[in-house]
């Protein structure tokens, strides 16, 4: 068996339910009705609150449990003395509470009510069976199907994964698309698919280096197979024998580029802001399959553009495109360097090299149009694996109807508790798949509803609704002496600095620190416009109140001192950017599950996807502001702020 399937030295089970423990926190008289195994488990949990680090090892906790049950059955102890009397004497609700907190970060797991009642963890004489973990495993292991791949590798798959592998083996020369929900093991499945295809002739593509590393681990130790989207495009564009262009140590800022290109501005926007708007236009162009810049790529404006304004913007964007062609080192200043590389490769007519027979794309919901064009020019078989719910801002990749499609709904990362949270979201989305999500019964992800002013535990990932939400949580957590980090530290610090400067434009002036204003504020001429755009965002209103109370660059610098990338820091990340990743502990912010009416059905659909992404990231524990089912029901009864005609 592969190590990712099961580690017999991993999880240890305690024979008591979470509900029983929570009941004891309210009323200790519940001890009277508990069995000896349950009482022993309660004592073990209490001991965790004061145990030393080495005793927190699951195996050590299991030994304590076994000794308690052995003492209960075999003694020696005085008449009338047993686990019941000792549990009542030693019971401490405070220790039990903190012991339960320790379990959240350990490899100890509480059993469900049915398994506690079955008592299969006991030997015939009533003592603890140390083989319980290994005996329990076959009954709950989702990886029950053995497969021997083309390289004589043993793979253990779920039933759904095994069915898909059989389809591929029976039809190796047919295109295939797999729509798989979060946690189905797409990267592992992709590794199994590659094993069944011709060695050295499969091109595996992943969107990010992190996803590529995960894929390589599944393929095999030391594997260098596969490329990121950017690496693939760069390889197509590189000319043999020509040295790679050296990156300039210092690149010109946006203001300098605007002056170089004679971008004077339009409407009330100056040259720098106009360049930011041109970058939005170019990003839309790079995501499309179009060959030339057109009005279809113009970003949305609250006040519609005149024909002259549109022509001016297209001319400026054309100049910027030419500049980027001549100065590729400036790509990294745009915020979308990978899209630029793919667009250049597509426009140049490149295709997948003929030495490859198959192309496999992981996380294909984020697959841009130019990459699809490059692949379609070749004659390779294309296999895509994606999850449409992990694309919050649109439908994502759509394969042709004639392409064989398969759905996988069984998640090996998410358990029944997460299943009950996600299915209401799937049911309420207006367009996407309605196939019911199914979590593995052997997985126990803890669910906790947190109060206001809650401080997450160390190492928790806080998934937010917007940059304002991230800024709010960073300020709140710093006030509580927590160390925080961001998925994009530089970008988030630039956002906060730009917000402070724009709020106090009379004191600082936009870009007064010599750096470019964050692209989020490309359309903002003044703070009043930012207010208008975000007046329904509670996190923005909270941040604005802090700015009004005197939060300035000096306070921002003090806040920055608490930024850290250490493992025990709290990572803040927009939920829609967390797709394809997984974390032990995840918190969803109140603004992510906002109660204010949404702008329209499209905005609500996007938020449903963002909440889906957030819920499905957790391996061990989820912290929620309130119940997901109630949140969905609440918004079903709400009207949107805007309604669209037909």
Named regions from a protein language model:
Residues 1-646:
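The feature marks helicase ATPase cores and/or their adjacent C-terminal helical subdomains
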């Amino acid at each position: 068996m592969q190590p990712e399937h099961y580690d017999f030295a991993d999880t240890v089970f305690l024979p008591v339910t979470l509900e029983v423990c929570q009941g004891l926190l309210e009323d200790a008289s519940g001890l009277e009705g508990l069995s000896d195994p349950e009482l022993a488990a309660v004592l073990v949990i209490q001991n965790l609150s004061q145990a030393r680090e080495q005793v927190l090892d699951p195996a050590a906790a299991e030994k304590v449990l076994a000794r308690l049950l052995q003492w209960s059955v075999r003694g020696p102890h005085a008449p009338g003395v047993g686990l019941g009397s000792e549990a009542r004497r030693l019971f401490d609700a405070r220790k039990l509470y903190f012991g339960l907190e320790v379990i959240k970060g350990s490899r100890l797991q509480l059993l469900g009510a049915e398994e506690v009642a079955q008592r299969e963890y006991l030997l015939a004489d009533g003592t603890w069976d140390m083989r319980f973990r290994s005996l329990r495993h076959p009954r709950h292991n989702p990886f029950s199907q053995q497969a021997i791949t083309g390289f004589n590798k043993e793979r253990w798959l779920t039933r759904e994964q095994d069915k898909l592998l059989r389809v591929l083996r029976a039809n190796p020369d047919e295109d295939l698309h797999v729509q798989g929900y979060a946690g189905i093991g797409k990267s592992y499945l992709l590794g199994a698919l590659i094993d069944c295809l011709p060695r050295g002739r499969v091109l595996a593509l992943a969107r990010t280096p992190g996803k590529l590393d995960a894929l390589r681990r599944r393929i095999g130790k030391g594997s260098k197979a596969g490329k990121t989207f950017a690496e693939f495009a760069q390889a197509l564009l590189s000319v043999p024998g020509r040295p790679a262009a050296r990156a300039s140590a210092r690149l010109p800022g946006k203001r300098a580029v605007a002056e170089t290109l004679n971008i004077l501005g339009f409407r009330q926007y100056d040259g720098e802001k106009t360049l930011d708007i041109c970058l939005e236009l170019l990003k839309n162009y790079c995501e499309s399959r179009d060959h030339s810049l057109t009005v279809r790529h113009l970003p949305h404006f609250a006040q519609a553009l005149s024909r002259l304004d549109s022509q001016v913007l297209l001319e400026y964007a054309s100049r910027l495109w030419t500049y980027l062609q001549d100065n590729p080192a400036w790509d990294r200043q745009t915020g979308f360097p990978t899209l630029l590389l793919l667009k250049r490769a597509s426009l140049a007519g490149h295709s997948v090299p003929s030495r490859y027979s198959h192309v496999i794309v992981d996380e294909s919901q984020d697959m841009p149009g130019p990459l699809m064009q490059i692949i379609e020019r070749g004659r390779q078989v294309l296999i895509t694996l994606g999850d449409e719910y992990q694309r919050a801002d649109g439908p994502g990749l759509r394969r042709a109807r004639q392409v064989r499609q398969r759905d996988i709904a069984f998640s090996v990362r998410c358990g029944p508790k997460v299943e009950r949270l996600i299915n209401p979201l799937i049911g309420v989305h207006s367009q996407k798949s309605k196939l019911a999500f199914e979590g593995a019964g052997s997985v126990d992800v803890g669910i906790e509803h947190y109060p206001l002013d809650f401080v997450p535990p160390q190492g928790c990932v806080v998934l937010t609704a917007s940059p304002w939400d991230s800024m709010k949580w960073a300020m709140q957590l710093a006030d509580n002496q927590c160390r925080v980090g961001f998925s994009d530290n530089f970008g988030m610090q630039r956002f906060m600095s730009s917000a402070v400067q724009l709020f106090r434009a009379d004191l600082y002036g936009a870009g007064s620190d010599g750096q470019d204003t964050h692209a989020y504020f490309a359309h903002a001429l003044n703070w009043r416009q930012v207010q208008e755009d975000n007046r329904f965002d509670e996190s923005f209103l909270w941040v604005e109140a802090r700015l009004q109370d005197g939060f300035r660059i000096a306070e921002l610098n003090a806040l920055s001192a608490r930024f850290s990338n250490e493992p025990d820091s709290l990572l803040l990340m927009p939920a829609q950017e967390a797709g394809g990743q997984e974390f032990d502990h995840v918190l969803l912010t109140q603004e992510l599950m906002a109660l204010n009416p949404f702008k329209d059905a499209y905005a609500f659909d996007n938020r449903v996807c963002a909440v889906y992404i957030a819920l499905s990231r957790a391996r061990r524990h989820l912290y929620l502001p309130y119940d997901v089912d109630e949140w969905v029901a609440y918004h079903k009864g709400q009207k949107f702020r805007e309604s669209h005609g037909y």
